Design a protein with these regions (language model features):
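Secretory-pathway lumenal glyco-enzymes, predominantly type II signal-anchor Golgi glycosyltransferases
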Residues: 1-155
Length: 155
């Protein structure tokens, strides 16, 4: 499983140069295509949360279209639970992060100033094929080209 691999590699919780690093996994509820396994997946997520203490789960369907909602919940949680946190790195579970390099980069930045770093994307087109996980219906975004944005794997 990807989360376990992250826990054992780059996502180990430890202190880097006296700075504690916390790892969290964000989950919603199983998507409709996982309905027949929903109960099993929920039990596994609850067990994992108890065992590792690093799983946050909210009551919304965990789909690509709800990714913004997932991040809004994370920011609310962070403000309530980690008010002294200086930086947040959000990334997908299919990326590798060189934690020490990220921290070296952040050491050059002031925690008193806003920072948003990532791969800047421009000229991207919305996917209109309904079978794609990246499908964006025209009712949600009617434009033909997205405004400039930072892309995930990590931002």
């Amino acid at each position: 499983e990807r989360r376990e691999l992250i826990r054992r590699t780059w996502g180990q919780e430890r202190s880097y140069g006296g700075r504690p690093v916390r790892r969290l996994f964000l989950l919603g509820t199983p998507a409709p295509e996982d309905a027949e396994r929903a109960e099993q997946l929920a039990e596994r997520a609850a067990l994992e949360a108890r065992e590792h203490g690093d799983v946050l789960q909210w009551a919304f369907t965990d789909t690509f279209l709800n990714l913004t909602l997932k991040h809004v919940h994370l920011l609310d949680w962070l403000e309530a639970r980690c008010p002294r946190a200086s930086f947040l790195l959000s990334g997908d579970d299919d990326v590798f992060v060189h934690t020490a390099n990220v921290l070296r980069f952040l050491e050059t930045k002031s925690p008193d100033r806003h920072l948003f770093a990532g791969q800047l994307m421009s000229g991207s087109l919305p996917i209109r094929e309904s079978w794609s996980k990246y499908f964006v219906p025209p009712q949600l975004f009617s434009g033909s080209v997205y405004p400039v944005y930072c892309s995930g794997g990590g931002f």
